[in-house]
């Protein structure tokens, strides 16, 4: 076993403190929880298809350049809240680009750590009846912990099984279990984030993530009005 502590700063201001732990591969019991039965990604709508229908510069940019394909089981939160509040979310994700076979596990795991931040707080939004375009919302990651249990293939479909056990005082807690396409548990993640709305006491309005006027009856896949 070994550990390494990393500190990052920008223009003299500390922006990150990270502690990483390592272990050499060794023999031992191989047990994990079972992945839930959910619709396969081939039967779900890609976020790329949704972005390409939205007349918004950020959406158009993501529709062309997003490095990962995301497919929500319960429906996405890009344009409107979920019809029913829930603290649970399932989604599939994989890289859009082919990953060379010789790519090391260091790269695969780094990419998973990078991309999971895009969706980790979505169960918090879902439980509060919010979406990425909720007017005035302010959101930021505060703390993040991640464990890698098995090898990761970021070029294959990964299933995120997420929940949010608590929200209070402008902070929300989220957890995720990440399974590979064969059902193996490859990673466990926990993250706390700031999720604030202008109705919260003493909170200034944020920018939200989308400023789009939607037509009545729009299901999130049609062009906004």
Predicted regions and their residues:
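Terminal targeting signals and extreme-terminal segments of soluble enzymes
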Residues: 1-225
